[in-house]
C-alpha cells in the first residue's frame, strides 16, 4: 500500500508543479502585455496638458505597474514594516538607494504616508514626475542579490522580461505628470485592480462559422436587404483597412518620436556632464603639474641647504682640534713641584728613587691610575723585602692617592679637574721639597 501511495502522490505532484509554472508564466505574459498597451494609451492621450490622478489611463497604468513590482514578492511579515506586511516599497527603498539625488528620503519623511503600500504608490508618482522611473528600475535590477532576497523564482524582475519592462518605461519620460502627494489622494489600504476591458478586442473569423450556422443565418432572414450575409462580422472596406493601418503607423510614430525626444534630451544632458568633467579634469591636471613643479623647486632648495650645511660642518671640524693643540703645551708649568715628596710621609722611608719621577704620556685618567697603582705595588714589595715599612702603620698612602690629593690641595690657581684628563701628565725630577703639609 505504501509504495503505491507514494507513487500516486508523486504522479499528482508533477502535474501540479507544471500547472504552477504555467500559471506563473501566464501571469508574466499578461502583465507585460497589458503594461505595453497601457504605455501606448498614455502616449496617445498625452497632448500638451500634464496627466494627473484624474486620468483613468494613468490609474490603470499605476495598478499594472504595482502588480508587476509585486509579482512573486516575498510578502512575509516584517518587524521593520509599520503595517506588519512588506511591500515592494521595502525592495525599492534598498535597491534604489544608490541612485544619485533619489527621492527615497523625501518619501520616508512624508507625514501623511505611513504604510508601505502607500509609500510605494507615492514613489511611482514622484518618479514619473522626475521622469526617472526607468532609471530607478534599471538600478534596482542591477542589484541582483537584493532582488533575489525579496522575490521568488519566476518573478518578472528575475527574468529576462525585466529588460523589456525598462524599455517600455523609457517612453514615459516624454510625458509630463503632475500629482499632489500632500493630500489624502494616495490610498494604502485597498489593493489595486487592473481594468482589462480597454485592451480586449475580439474579432470573429469567417472560418469559425459552420455551414449549418451559415444556412440558418441565411434562411432566418426575413428580407434580403435587412441584414448582411454575416451579421456578426464587420464588413471592412479598403478605405477602413487603410485607415486602420494609418492609425497603427501613427501610434508607432508617436512612440518613436517620444522616445527620440527623450533620448535627445538624455544625450544633451550627458554632453553637458561630459564637458563639466573635461573641464574638471583639465583643472586637476593643471593643479597636479603646478604641485609637481613646486615640489621640484622645494627639493632643489633643500639640496642647496644640505650642501651649505655640509660645507659649514667641514669648516668647523679643523677648528675643534686647534684648541687642544694650544692647550697641551700649557700643562707643564703649574703641575711642576706640586707632587708631595715621599720622604715627608715617613721618616723611616728609604731615599727617594729618582726613577719614580718620570715623564709619561697617558691617553686618559684610567691609564694614569693604573700606572700609579702598579708603581705602588712594586714599591710595597720592595719595602717588604728590605724589611722596612715605607709608610705609617695602619694606613695605605698609595702614590696615586697622594699625588691626586697633593695636586688638588696645593693648586689654588685656575687649574680645574678637567686638566687632569689631558693627554699628558708631567712630573718633575727636581730635588725641591714638597709642600709643607703632609697627610697625617
UniProtKB/Swiss-Prot annotation:
UniProt feature coiled coil, ranges: 262-317
Gene3D superfamilies: 1.20.58.900
Annotated spans, Disordered: 213-233, 374-402
Sequence ranges assigned to domain RUN in this UniProt record: 52-184
SMART domains in the cross-refs: RUN (SM00593)
This protein's UniProt keywords: Coiled coil
Key word Coiled coil present: yes
Highest taxon above the source species: Eukaryota
Keyword Coiled coil: yes
Family: Belongs to the RUNDC3 family.
Protein name (Swiss-Prot/TrEMBL): RUN domain-containing protein 3A
Organism phylogeny: Eukaryota, Metazoa, Chordata, Craniata, Vertebrata
Amino acid at each position: 500500500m505504501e509504495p503505491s501511495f507514494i507513487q500516486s502522490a508523486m504522479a499528482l505532484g508533477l502535474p501540479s508543479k507544471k500547472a504552477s509554472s504555467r500559471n506563473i508564466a501566464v501571469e508574466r505574459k499578461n502583465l507585460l502585455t497589458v503594461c505595453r498597451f497601457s504605455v501606448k494609451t498614455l502616449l496617445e492621450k498625452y497632448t500638451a496638458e500634464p496627466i494627473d490622478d484624474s486620468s483613468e489611463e494613468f490609474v490603470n497604468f499605476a495598478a499594472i505597474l504595482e502588480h508587476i513590482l509585486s509579482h512573486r514578492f516575498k510578502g512575509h511579515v516584517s518587524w521593520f514594516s509599520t503595517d506588519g506586511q512588506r511591500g515592494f516599497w521595502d525592495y525599492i527603498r534598498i535597491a534604489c538607494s544608490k541612485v544619485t539625488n533619489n527621492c527615497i528620503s523625501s518619501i520616508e519623511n512624508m507625514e501623511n504616508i505611513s504604510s508601505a503600500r502607500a509609500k510605494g504608490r507615492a514613489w511611482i508618482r514622484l518618479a514619473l514626475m522626475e521622469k526617472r522611473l526607468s532609471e530607478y528600475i534599471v538600478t534596482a535590477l542591477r542589484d541582483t542579490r537584493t532582488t533575489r532576497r525579496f522575490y521568488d523564482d519566476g518573478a518578472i524582475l528575475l527574468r529576462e522580461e525585466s529588460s523589456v519592462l525598462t524599455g517600455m518605461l523609457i517612453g514615459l519620460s516624454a510625458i509630463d505628470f503632475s500629482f499632489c502627494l500632500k493630500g489624502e489622494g494616495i490610498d494604502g489600504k485597498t489593493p489595486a485592480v487592473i481594468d482589462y476591458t480597454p485592451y480586449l478586442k475580439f474579432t470573429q473569423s469567417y472560418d469559425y462559422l459552420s455551414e449549418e450556422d451559415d444556412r440558418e443565418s441565411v434562411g432566418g432572414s426575413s428580407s434580403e436587404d435587412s441584414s448582411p450575409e454575416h451579421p456578426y462580422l464587420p464588413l471592412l472596406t479598403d478605405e477602413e483597412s487603410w485607415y486602420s493601418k494609418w492609425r497603427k503607423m501613427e501610434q508607432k510614430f508617436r512612440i518613436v518620436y517620444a522616445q527620440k525626444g527623450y533620448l535627445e534630451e538624455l544625450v544633451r544632458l550627458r554632453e553637458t556632464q561630459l564637458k563639466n568633467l573635461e573641464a574638471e579634469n583639465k583643472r586637476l591636471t593643471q593643479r597636479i603639474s603646478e604641485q609637481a613643479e613646486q615640489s621640484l623647486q622645494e627639493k632643489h632648495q633643500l639640496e642647496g641647504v644640505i650642501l651649505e650645511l655640509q660645507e659649514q660642518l667641514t669648516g668647523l671640524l679643523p677648528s675643534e682640534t686647534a684648541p687642544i693643540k694650544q692647550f697641551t703645551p700649557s700643562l707643564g708649568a703649574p703641575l711642576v713641584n706640586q707632587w708631595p715628596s715621599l720622604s715627608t710621609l715617613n721618616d723611616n722611608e728609604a731615599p727617594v728613587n729618582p726613577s719614580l719621577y718620570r715623564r709619561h704620556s697617558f691617553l686618559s685618567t684610567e691609564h694614569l691610575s693604573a700606572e700609579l697603582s702598579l708603581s705602588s705595588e712594586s714599591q710595597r714589595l720592595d719595602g717588604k723585602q728590605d724589611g722596612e715599612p715605607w709608610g705609617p702603620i695602619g694606613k695605605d698612602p698609595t702614590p696615586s692617592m697622594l699625588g691626586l690629593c697633593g695636586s688638588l690641595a696645593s693648586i689654588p690657581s685656575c687649574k680645574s679637574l678637567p686638566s687632569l684628563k689631558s693627554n699628558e701628565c708631567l712630573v718633575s725630577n727636581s730635588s725641591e721639597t714638597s709642600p709643607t703639609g703632609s697627610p697625617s
